[in-house]
């Protein structure tokens, strides 16, 4: 990978992109940290009996909190233009981001499959939906997330830049390694989970329409919200990843040429947008809660999730998928495995 940079001062466009990234990351931190903390508090303190869905939502909020706790380090990097936290901090921050991204997307997939099974095979779902099974699934999700994020530890390093400055940067032995990492992340962190989510909710929508559920119209709107929110935050990021992978396979170094420079600019904003996805869940909870927010006050999250323990049986009675869907939107968003240092000043200065 090319680790040299131009000595020219950053252009106005680059400064604007960096400022926009700082704004997005600051909003994510300001909204997501208290929002997800409130969700964790609501489930742990306000719910006496936690359903399987509540346990998944709890883990999702914890994953979002983990990635948001790394945001101050990246904000410092963007503001100062240098990485000040050493090699261990570099790898740890990016590894936490990777684990959070995978944990979030796998939790989303698990919740989607759970919903689909509850509608398609309610009796089977009722037998499988135990806290013991949920804990095993959650443990498996976290173990798999830690494993899938390990390439970050192999490729991230701290490289010198200018005088007395350094960058936390991905350094690959070859362009083939860069292509592999980007494609691997796009496939495992978006494509396969997204296909599972779409298939699950498409099946739910088809079955609800066939059974003429009273709340199917509302459920349909929520399903669309779930899928669009998921895609809006992650599709652009992974499209850029795949475009970069294509350039790597063609032997073109990152950030070089007109296309490479534009991809580097876009990547700054899209990585910050992916961080912002970790703050959107509490907002979706509030939107899905409807009247509960007004009637239950600070306890609305607990009220929202209280009915999910009997989703399977209530689904058979034909009236509860509104509750099921209400818990769904909160599941759709994870943290990015690439931090803002992935589109570092090293690349941005090459745009001049």
From Swiss-Prot:
Tissue: Expressed at highest levels in heart, skeletal muscle and at lower levels in brain and liver. High level of expression in lymphoid tissues.
Disulfide bonds: none
Extracellular-side positions: 1-19, 76-91, 160-178, 243-268
Entry's transmembrane regions: 20-42, 55-75, 92-113, 139-159, 179-199, 222-242, 269-289
One BP term from GO: G protein-coupled receptor signaling pathway
Ranges per topology, Cytoplasmic: 43-54, 114-138, 200-221, 290-352
Keyword Phosphoprotein: yes
Single GO MF annotation: leukotriene receptor activity
Glycan-linked positions: 2, 164
Alphabetic keyword roster: Cell membrane, G-protein coupled receptor, Glycoprotein, Membrane, Phosphoprotein, Receptor, Transducer, Transmembrane, Transmembrane helix
Region (Disordered): 310-352
UniProt topology in membrane: Multi-pass membrane protein
Principal place of residence: membrane
Protein name: Leukotriene B4 receptor 1
Species for this entry: Homo sapiens (Human)
